């Protein structure tokens, strides 16, 4: 196994099965963040992740973290919070502000560089990248953005400025996603936060099988049209 240098003249990627074991999933470097290359990457289970000043690095880790939306873990405390929630959740209302929020909410720095922001804004303009926003009155207090692949949604990042805001975004999105034919959410690499919400790890080859099938399955018509999302409270 060796790290592959991508060409600027071809958007092809090597097989994810050739990714390094350490660091886990590192597959290639270089290339660019053009819409065509990004879409090619997501179609093959690959995503960019690199620090400011580093070359573009492309990853496909094994195992892969995923969330089956019907398995979202709603804790008792979160259920009580949601039943009296002061938040309003929207879809694709403020993509630029969500990705900016994800880039700026970490004190220790971010991997979301200006180039990443510009690249995903272009994907959003083309209808491939989407955002879920959480509002308290008129203030944006949390959100998620990611890339759609048919009935699979590749979550990229989330942020929260007030209590349970990003959890609310994911909870409401999961319910709406299921209702419109969504099957799986890619969480890339498992962490304590996503694990607490129900994410699990599966083998990369199993993720790639799911991706190949689900990206061919369209969601219900006009699912990504900007609108307010609702979840019945119980």
UniProtKB/Swiss-Prot annotation:
The protein's Enzyme Commission number: 2.3.2.6
Function: Functions in the N-end rule pathway of protein degradation where it conjugates Leu, Phe and, less efficiently, Met from aminoacyl-tRNAs to the N-termini of proteins containing an N-terminal arginine or lysine.
Cross-referenced Pfam families: Leu_Phe_trans
Keyword Cytoplasm: yes
Catalysed reactions, semicolon-separated: N-terminal L-lysyl-[protein] + L-leucyl-tRNA(Leu) = N-terminal L-leucyl-L-lysyl-[protein] + tRNA(Leu) + H(+); N-terminal L-arginyl-[protein] + L-leucyl-tRNA(Leu) = N-terminal L-leucyl-L-arginyl-[protein] + tRNA(Leu) + H(+); L-phenylalanyl-tRNA(Phe) + an N-terminal L-alpha-aminoacyl-[protein] = an N-terminal L-phenylalanyl-L-alpha-aminoacyl-[protein] + tRNA(Phe)
SUPFAM superfamilies hit by this protein: Acyl-CoA N-acyltransferases (Nat)
GO CC annotation: cytoplasm
GO biological process, one term: protein catabolic process
Native source organism of the sequence: Salmonella dublin (strain CT_02021853)
Keyword Transferase: yes
Molecular function in Gene Ontology: leucyl-tRNA--protein transferase activity
Domain of life: Bacteria
Name this protein carries in UniProt: Leucyl/phenylalanyl-tRNA--protein transferase
Compartments reported by the entry: Cytoplasm
Gene3D superfamilies per UniProt: Leucyl/phenylalanyl-tRNA-protein transferase, C-terminal domain (3.40.630.70), Leucyl/phenylalanyl-tRNA-protein transferase, N-terminal domain (3.30.70.3550)
The family this protein is said to belong to: Belongs to the L/F-transferase family.
UniProt entry keywords in alphabetical sequence: Acyltransferase, Cytoplasm, Transferase
InterPro entries assigned: Acyl_CoA_acyltransferase (IPR016181), Leu/Phe-tRNA_Trfase (IPR004616), Leu/Phe-tRNA_Trfase_C (IPR042203), Leu/Phe-tRNA_Trfase_N (IPR042221)
């Amino acid at each position: 196994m060796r790290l592959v240098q991508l060409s600027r003249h071809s958007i092809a990627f090597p097989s994810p099965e050739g990714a390094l074991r350490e660091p886990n999933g590192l597959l290639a470097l270089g290339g660019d963040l053009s819409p065509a290359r990004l879409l090619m990457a997501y179609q093959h289970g690959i995503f960019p992740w690199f620090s400011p000043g580093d070359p573009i690095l492309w990853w496909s880790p094994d195992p892969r973290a995923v969330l089956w939306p019907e398995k979202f873990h709603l804790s008792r405390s979160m259920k009580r919070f949601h039943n009296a929630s002061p938040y309003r959740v929207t879809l694709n209302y403020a993509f630029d502000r969500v990705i900016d929020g994800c880039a700026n909410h970490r004190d220790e720095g971010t991997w979301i560089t200006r180039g990443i922001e510009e690249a995903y804004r272009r994907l959003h303009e083309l209808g491939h990248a989407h955002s879920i926003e959480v509002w308290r009155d008129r203030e944006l207090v949390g959100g998620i953005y990611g890339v759609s692949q048919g009935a699979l949604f590749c979550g990229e990042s989330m942020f929260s400025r007030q209590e349970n805001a990003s959890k609310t975004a994911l909870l409401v999105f999961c319910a709406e996603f299921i209702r419109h034919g969504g099957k799986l959410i890619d969480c890339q690499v498992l962490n304590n936060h996503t694990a607490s919400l129900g994410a699990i790890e599966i083998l990369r080859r199993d993720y790639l099988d799911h991706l190949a099938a689900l990206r061919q399955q369209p969601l219900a018509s006009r699912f990504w049209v900007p609108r307010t999302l609702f979840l019945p409270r119980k």
